[in-house]
Amino acid sequence: MKKFKKYFGTVLLLLLIGIVKPVEAENVDIVELTKNAGYEVNPANKPKASIVVDAYTGRILWQDNIDEVRDPASISKVMTVYLVMEAIANGELSIDQKITATKEDQAISNIYAISNNKIVEGVEYPIEELLKMTLVPSSNAATLMLANAITNDSAKFVEKMNAKAKELGMNHTYFNNASGAVAELFQGYYNPEGYDASKPNQTTARDLAILAMDIMNRFPKVLEYTNSAVVKTMEGTPYEEKFDTYNYSLPGAKYGIEGVNGLKTGSSGYGAFNYIATYDKDQMKLVEVVLGVGDWSNQDGEFIRHTFGNAILNYVLEHFSYRTILSAGEHNFDGHKITTNKTLSMIVEKGKIPEWQVENKKINVKLSGDFLKDNQKNPSVDVVAESGFADLPKEPEKRKQTLQVYIVQNAFAFAVIIGGSILFILVLFGESRAKKRRKQKRK
């Protein structure tokens, strides 16, 4: 019985700690995390950098070496796709516009040293099909055809890439080429003037998360091209091709996770194995970047990167959830009645009570943690005071209403604790009665 009491007390304590303890992802060992997720792990393959962010706000939920400069390899193509989607949105291009393949395009598609698909001189390729070819089989030829649709000056296009990176706040990113393959691999068919043909592009996990978050929110149609494990291009024509995704975290792929719907992989001798995953399920909208997994000499790295990435993503999903913090309507704060004009919902740590700050006729949620960029912040809602708004405290204590919301949102944990406590009391009561019966028998 003593052992039971000790064990049960420990369980209850752990349950309570699990409810109130904030997540500290930066202190988690990635190798152990991946092992515990059931994957075979070689510590030498550990990612050099990784990040997971809330795609609504830019709040960082997981980070490891996020500002280390790395070669993104073919992930660079996401910026080219971004510029094309922006040109379409601005009316400069159209999604069904056709690009006629040149002799040079066909020659580039036949270069074995870089990733490609079959491009045939004289064939008209719709921009939408070229986008699929760029994002899934990672075709360098298709990427350059898209870049040339914006400008035939390859150097000016790279200049546009760098300008857009600066505009988005990608402060540690520099492009030397449009596709992620160094220009010297193109056998003279591609060489942006003024850019080093032997140097790879440079970026960081943070910067790629900024780019992915922006393209996910601004141009969600891109995810329609990346959300399937198998993709067909030029379907119904003599040039139809079928491609299996390299993003093995997509549902239906080798390490598929429900909710993953993009975005791009990349690998090179300089940068090893990398990928960006986008996730959207149960209103959890996330961007994950994993860089520098394994070594180029072992091509299994294209699978291994997803074991680490999946373990990290699942860790975040276990510790965070999308919740309604404050519903639209009238609320009572310490006797002051105010009305919010909309419901406030967001991604928050499980088991953590969000604090609110009332200031300048707004309710601001206060959450710990960094953001991708300095101008990003936690969401807020406008309020209309029905009484005493000016007297509301700027730093309110945890209120009765907050606790009530918290209890509802953590009903299962509280049910376990309350139920367990009742069971514990019943066991003690039963033991007490048993002792009395034993004493009576001795008499």
Regions flagged by a language model, labelled:
Residues L12, A147, E302:
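Short amphipathic alpha-helical segments
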Residues A25-A205, M216-F219:
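Active-site-adjacent loops and short helices of periplasmic peptidoglycan-processing enzymes
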